[in-house]
Amino acid sequence: MVPEGKMRRFGRAVGTALLAGVLLGACSGSGGDDRTKTIVDPAFLAEEQAWRNQRLDDLLRPDGWTSLVGLHWLELKAHYIGSGERIGNGVRMAFGPEKMGLLQRDRSGTWTFTPEKGVELTLDGEPLKGKVVLRNDQDPQPSVIGFDEGRGLVTLLRRGDRDALRVRHADAPTRLQFAGLEYWPADPSWRIEGRFIPHPPGKTLPIGDIVGTLSDSPNPGVVEFERDGRSFRLEALGEPGSELFFVLADRTSGHGSYPAGRFLEAAWPGPDGKVVLDFNRAYNPPCAFTLFATCPLPPPENRLDLLVTAGEKNYVSPVH
């Protein structure tokens, strides 16, 4: 499983602080205790800051991960959905029309949606007028129901043998009250060149997620790298034509970084098998920002006995 969907002002303020005056970085060993200050290349800092700015912009998009307002598991064959108090055994949403419509599942497991009369909705950006079949997020083009003039979005998820509705809204408190991202100082010593060791074609790796689902994910190979004279390995997920994706934990997990681990991406290796792991770009999964995501967890192979004092720190939400 790859991360669902595979990632302003605060970011730019951080960038100004990083680039102002004498540009200093902190180079640290695996323990993070013996730090020696060194001049850091301004071009490197600018690259890292540009990435951080884009990361923040992606999170704060009207349909970004901070916009999630609901994850509703569908346990019955039929559910009315809406925000009204009289929705009964249906799915009560945090935003939207009091009564939006009816979800129904047939014997094959296919879900259909019938909109409530008089409610203005869209399906994939076009006006929704009648009963439709919904494609879940395992489809290359999942169905998207829009409401509140496009500020709200509903999608169908499939996790193992369970189905759920995910609801997003641009007015989500987690988005409007977002507290900003914090990082360890950008450090070029954490941009590490590793060696890609391919697995036999078709190999998969079981990946669990935060809601208890176990899925077999494409596992093309492992990346071996060194830090402070020690060798480490990270199992990669992904398929040719995409980036390598890593779900990892380290000794900062729960001690500075998000307890359930972080994500990291890297370019697919070339013929020489070299892979650059930039741990400055290790980032939090969506579950660090919302209760309504279904994030993959690090496999045992990717739990590093290493203090990775680089990348994104744990997020402290002002929304409870």
Give the residues covered by each predicted segment.
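Mid-length scaffold segments of soluble, non-membrane domains
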Residues: L103-S108, L214-S257
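Forkhead-associated
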Residues: L68, W73-Q141
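Bacterial N-terminal signal peptides that target proteins for export
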Residues: V2-A17
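Extended, aromatic/histidine-rich regions of cofactor-dependent oxidoreductases associated
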Residues: Y183, R251-G254, E265-A267, K274-V276, ...
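Surface-exposed beta-loop interaction hotspot
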Residues: D148-S215
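N-terminal pre-domain segments of enzymes
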Residues: D33-H72
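C-terminal motif of bacterial Sec signal peptides marking the signal peptidase cleavage site
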Residues: L24-A26
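Bacterial signal peptide processing site
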Residues: S28-G31
